[in-house]
Regions:
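Catalytic DNA-binding helix-loop module of base-excision-repair DNA glycosylases/AP lyases
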Residues: 40-43, 94-100, 108-154, 161-167, ...
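Alpha-helix N-capping/helix-start residues
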Residues: 74-75, 124, 144, 174
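Amphipathic alpha-helical protein-protein interaction surfaces
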Residues: 48, 122, 135, 139, ...
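N-terminal polyanion-binding entry modules of DNA glycosylases/AP lyases
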Residues: 1-111, 175-176, 183-241
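Alpha-helix N-cap/helix-start motif
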Residues: 52, 139-143, 161, 177, ...
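Ferredoxin-type iron-sulfur electron-transfer modules in oxidoreductases and energy-metabolism complexes
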Residues: 170
Length: 241
């Protein structure tokens, strides 16, 4: 797996050094700590990274912590996060989450995935993002990029992000988990795009099923129609170093 992750970074740096993902930017900036990453992940759904980062910075310039956001008026929050998709729904959701963090956890975001997924709008991907970017705990957040690229490479053969997460957890040594989301997301945004992936410059194409089987040239989908029982290909038997 290290070879794949390093190859992705080498490819991106050779083509054009990628912009940090919104969550990595929040992690580096330490804007509001773990709570900002929790809120930022909720806001990031169906939103461009640059918009997410700007909105989160503006939001935490106004509301510094869970208690302040919990007491915010919905229309004021809507006004701040308007540049992102579904801002009305998300405004209500993040205020609800702020109230839970403030009242049930004393303002501190829990580091337990079961407690995180019990919050409004927080699924496994969001919870795993919090574990990785807020607490640097090993987890594999699977979004559309991680799901697509994992299937294209032939690491897994799955239908849903949930299946992909479970398959990758069995396949990849835990020491590599922290790098997967950040690297795969940047690679999916810049190189291994949903349409017209840049296979010609990809330094890991020799290990890519999508490229080696000719699916990239034929314009085929990233995942074959047939799927063996269990949600993962025989590739899941490979032990990565």
């Amino acid at each position: 797996m290290k070879k794949i992750l390093d190859g992705m970074m080498s490819t991106m740096n050779a083509v054009k050094p990628p912009r940090m993902t919104a969550l990595r930017e929040l992690h580096e900036a330490e804007t509001g700590g773990p709570f900002s990453i929790l809120i930022g992940t909720i806001l990031s759904a169906r939103t461009k990274d640059e918009n997410t980062a700007k909105v989160v910075r503006a939001l935490f310039a106004r509301y510094r912590d869970a208690r302040e956001l919990a007491g915010a008026k919905i229309r004021d929050v809507e006004r701040i996060i308007r540049p992102i998709g579904f801002y009305r729904v998300k405004a209500r959701r993040i205020i609800e989450v702020a109230k839970i963090v403030d009242s049930e956890y004393g303002g501190a975001v829990p580091e337990d995935i079961d407690k995180l997924v019990g919050m409004p709008g927080v699924g496994r991907k969001t919870a795993n993002c919090v574990l990785v970017y807020a607490f640097e705990k090993p987890a594999i957040p699977v979004d559309i990029h991680v799901h697509r690229i994992s299937n294209r490479l032939g690491l897994v053969e799955t239908k849903t992000p949930e299946e992909t997460e479970q398959a990758l957890m069995k396949l990849v040594p835990k020491r590599h988990w922290l790098r997967i989301n950040d690297t795969f997301v940047m690679y999916g945004q810049n190189i291994c795009k949903p349409v017209s992936p840049m296979c010609g410059v990809c330094q890991i194409r020799a290990d890519c099923r999508f490229y080696q089987t000719g699916m990239a040239a034929s314009g085929s989908s990233s995942r074959p129609a047939s799927r063996p029982r269990g949600g993962a290909t025989a590739a899941t038997k490979v032990k990565f170093s």
